[in-house]
Amino acid sequence: MSSSPDIAGILDNTKELDRLRKEQEEVLVEINKMHKKLQATPEIVEKPGDISLSKLKNLYIQAKELSESEVTVSNILLTQLDSLLPSGPTGQQRRKLEGNEQKRKRMKVDTDVTRVSPSMRNQIEAYASLKGEQVAARVTAEDAEKDEWFVVKVIHFDRETKEVEVLDEEPGDDEEGGGQRTYKLSMSCILPFPKRNDPSSTQEFIPGKHVLAVYPGTTALYKATVISTPRKRKSDEYLLEFDDDEEDGALPQRTVPFHKVVALPEGHRQ
């Protein structure tokens, strides 16, 4: 009879877990709606009084808080369940557990993926699909004075650690050894390029927008300002002005293919 309160507590927490997950789903639906709206009409954020970005930020904060609450309640449930289970498995249970050890190891990654939110699962699948593709990667440390971004090739994505292993196929002359170099980076250090063969589905950056783009003739990306868009130019290239690219007292305008231009990361240091 003494376990009844524990059972009641477990049931209460499972209900709370269901509620949190339903709320997360609702918030993620709203986030996806905002993403589609901004992709379809990116110029809306330039209008005075528009609060789209502020609303999106608040939705992300709400999603983060719900996710953290889900983790907290899940941990409480684990503790409650542990207190009701026998202190150790029987001999038969132990043999079964040991026999399943390898199976558990194989299933661990898939289990971890099912614990994360739907949006994170989608993000993980998206990054896993990048193997063999070129992406933009920040290879400098978080506390570095300047951010350095290069074109690299994805060679592996670890679903468990959420790390992306990339290959710098054309390191600069000042790199030690001068050969190809690999990096293991977090997902936040990777920016996928637009699909070269599908320009119609690519977000177009409006004139005046700051972007990160591959400097012509190099594999390095730098901050630039959009002067003209591919649609306006009736081509597959942006016309850009790169920061710190001054020649004869003026910034030259350079063309860059749309599939080598990405959104400027927040807090970019150059």
From Swiss-Prot:
Q: Which residues carry this modification: N-acetylserine?
A: 2
One GO cellular component this record assigns the protein to is: nucleus
Region: Histone H3K4me3 N-terminus binding; residue ranges are: 168-170, 217-220
Which positions are tagged coiled coil?
A: none
Q: Does the keyword Acetylation apply?
A: yes
The organs and tissues expressing this protein are described as: Expressed in roots, rosette leaves, cauline leaves, stems and flowers.
The family database entries (InterPro entries) matched by this protein are listed as:
SGF29, SGF29_tudor-like_dom, Tudor_SGF29_rpt1, Tudor_SGF29_rpt2
Q: Which family does this protein fall into?
A: Belongs to the SGF29 family.
Written domain comment of the UniProt record: The SGF29 tudor-like domain mediates binding to methylated 'Lys-4' of histone H3 (H3K4me).
Name of this protein: SAGA-associated factor 29 homolog A
Which species expresses this protein natively?
Answer: Arabidopsis thaliana
Q: What is the lineage of its organism?
A: Eukaryota, Viridiplantae, Streptophyta, Embryophyta, Tracheophyta
